[in-house]
Every structure is written in C-alpha cells, then in structure tokens.
Amino acid sequence: MGIEEKLPAGVLLTSVEKFVNWSRKSSVWGATFGLACCAIEMMAAGGPHYDMGRWGMEVFRASPRQADLMIVAGRVSQKMAPVLRQIYDQMAEPRWVLSMGVCASSGGMFNNYAIVQGVDHVVPVDMYLPGCPPRPEMLIDAILKLREKIMHEPLGPNGRKMAEARKARGDVPVVPYGSMPSSYRSDKARRAEWTKAVREGREEQLRIENWMKAQPHLQQYEGLKK
C-alpha cells in the first residue's frame, strides 16, 4: 500500500531528473560518421534485422544539430580530426560519443603518423567498443550500456553540484572512467596534469591544445608556434 493507491487513476509519480533522463535515453539520435569497415557493421545494425527502433534510434541524422550521439566507426586520420571536432561542437547538448572498434579507440593496426591514436585525443568518449570490426550485436550492447549511463546522469546545476560533492567526498573517481585520453594513462605526470585540468573544468581546452601541438602543419594557423 503506497501513495499511488490514494491518487486518481492515470497519475504517475516520478522525479523530474529520472523522467528527463528516461526520455533522453529513449530517443538517442545518432549522427552519421562512418569512417572505415566498422561503418558497414553500423549500417547492418541500423537495418530491419536488428530493429534499433525499439530504442528510439532507428534513423541516423545527417545534421549534427539534430543528433546527440556520435558513433565514431573506424580509424580517424589527422586530416579528419578537425572535421570530427567541428561536427561534435555542432551537436546538441547533451551529447555523447561512442568509439566503435579498436582503430577508433587506440589507432589499432594503424600505428603511424597519419592516424590519430585514439579518438579520445580529439573529443571526450563516453563508451568504448572493442573489436575489429565489432559485430552489430556488440554495437547494440554498447548502446544499451550507454543508455544506462544516460539514465543516471545528474540533471541541471543542482545535479552537477551533487556530483561535485560526491567527487569531493571520494564517493566516485575525480576523473570518470573513459574520459582520460589513452596516452595519459601510462604516464604518471600526464595523469596528474589531466586530473588537475578536470578539477579546473578545462579538460576540453587541454585536449585540443595537446592535439594541436602534435600537428606542426597547423601550429602556424593557431599561433601556437613560437
């Protein structure tokens, strides 16, 4: 016997945060960003056999302003990285990134100067999906896990304050799993640099600055070259 028994029929009780997050996770719209062979598996997942419309994402959006999920399907070249960042910046808030396949996540077998060694050097990644290429079932599983993450995200300024309070108490890590670029994880000094940037709220600035410093041909345009 709860309060629901005393209310008129047709009344549903919930918190605004849970309701908004439920609506967000139930209508995740993906942006078309296929780069290599992983895109073929992404196309297969979007077909009628797997019926992704069950989760409200049966259509991939051609405009980033109408999308809130970027699935990076394939390796990212150095020339494609600025385009990827521009599309990410044009996406609606809140937005999420799923790195599909080992090439997008760490460069994979393309360990050379032409390929970005992990898309997390360019944009923040919310979910990593291994495989070369991962099957459509694996992509759907990663999307379902991302939906659960969306469901528990804080909402609004009060929610962010609560999340910061939890971080201060040590209830959750200062740097959420998956947000730190892969090249920072093996170096203690760089990990400390990233953690400090997260505390100061400038991790995106640090991510872009480090990527630009690694591109000598772009430094002259950004005024970074001394």
UniProtKB/Swiss-Prot annotation:
Co-factor binding comment: Binds 1 [4Fe-4S] cluster.
Which GO cellular component terms, listed alphabetically, does the Swiss-Prot or TrEMBL entry include?
A: plasma membrane; respiratory chain complex I
What is one Pfam family matched by this protein?
Oxidored_q6
The answer to whether keyword Chloroplast applies is: no
> What SUPFAM superfamilies has UniProt attached to this entry?
HydA/Nqo6-like
| Catalytic activity annotation | a quinone + NADH + 5 H(+)(in) = a quinol + NAD(+) + 4 H(+)(out)
GO BP terms: namely:
aerobic respiration; electron transport coupled proton transport
EC number(s) given by UniProt: 7.1.1.-
Molecular function terms from GO: 4 iron, 4 sulfur cluster binding; iron ion binding; NADH dehydrogenase (ubiquinone) activity; NADH:ubiquinone reductase (non-electrogenic) activity; quinone binding
What this protein is reported to do is described as: NDH-1 shuttles electrons from NADH, via FMN and iron-sulfur (Fe-S) centers, to quinones in the respiratory chain. The immediate electron acceptor for the enzyme in this species is believed to be a menaquinone. Couples the redox reaction to proton translocation (for every two electrons transferred, four hydrogen ions are translocated across the cytoplasmic membrane), and thus conserves the redox energy in a proton gradient.
What keyword terms does UniProt attach to this protein? 4Fe-4S, Cell membrane, Iron, Iron-sulfur, Membrane, Metal-binding, NAD, Quinone, Translocase, Transport
This protein is called NADH-quinone oxidoreductase subunit B 2
Principal cellular location given in the protein's record: membrane
Cofactors that this protein relies on: [4Fe-4S] cluster
**Organism of this sequence:** Salinispora tropica (strain ATCC BAA-916 / DSM 44818 / JCM 13857 / NBRC 105044 / CNB-440)
UniProt lists the family membership as follows: Belongs to the complex I 20 kDa subunit family.
Positions contributing to [4Fe-4S] cluster binding: 37-38, 103, 132
